[in-house]
């Protein structure tokens, strides 16, 4: 049985840990509020640019744009959004596991895929296994701005246009609320949804006149749209990260409180046993003197 001193030391150290996790929980809660606001405020922009792309791409003259049309897939690109730090439950592991399993299932060679990582967790995991990481970025702030992701977003589009890969998927955690999120896999390129809408739409867009031409507009608009999708996913993932960390720290704080209660009970029992032992020894000694 542990001594009273050992138990007391464990209670003290657990209480200090509880104070740290409680503070981290409160910090994450504050960050979550702002992250949710950032994600919500960005949605109207993405929605509006999508409407514009839909109108332009639905014309017959622009349906053959290379970013809108599927082509034979020889190589697949994977964008993986994770965090730089842990202490966020399964936030990182769920995304990494999904991508890892997908690659192992679909590809037999590293020449058949390319990984783009955002966050140290994904980079370290895939590089430790000598997997094909072609682009990486770390140090994304808690409340990112587009400049932080612009290079990797524009390079993603450029590599597709250059034929480095023939399709691109993005994997991230979608924020639902403070206690739940869901893993999302979305196709970024090619933008076949607009090509299909162009075939299905009942709206006659031939009366629209474009200046400059539809192709010239799409040359600028489509890369911006894909970049906006990547940034929007990053904002969403950041909200999910803060929520996951807040939940993990709350759970850690609750577990620490339970452990302190158990240790306190154990301490009191050990102390009572020690006192009982001392009384027994005193009584026994007194009886021996009689």
From Swiss-Prot:
GO BP field: proton motive force-driven ATP synthesis; proton motive force-driven plasma membrane ATP synthesis
Keyword presence, Transport: yes
Membrane topology note: Peripheral membrane protein
Location within or outside the cell: Cell membrane
Any one GO molecular-function label of the UniProt entry: proton-transporting ATP synthase activity, rotational mechanism
Keywords tagged on the record: ATP synthesis, Cell membrane, CF(1), Hydrogen ion transport, Ion transport, Membrane, Transport
Pfam families: ATP-synt
Gene3D superfamilies tied to this protein: 3.40.1380.10, ATP synthase, gamma subunit, helix hairpin domain
Annotated function: Produces ATP from ADP in the presence of a proton gradient across the membrane. The gamma chain is believed to be important in regulating ATPase activity and the flow of protons through the CF(0) complex.
Assembly mode: F-type ATPases have 2 components, CF(1) - the catalytic core - and CF(0) - the membrane proton channel. CF(1) has five subunits: alpha(3), beta(3), gamma(1), delta(1), epsilon(1). CF(0) has three main subunits: a, b and c.
HAMAP family (alphabetical): ATP_synth_gamma_bact (MF_00815)
Protein name: ATP synthase gamma chain
Source lineage: Bacteria, Bacillati, Bacillota, Bacilli, Bacillales
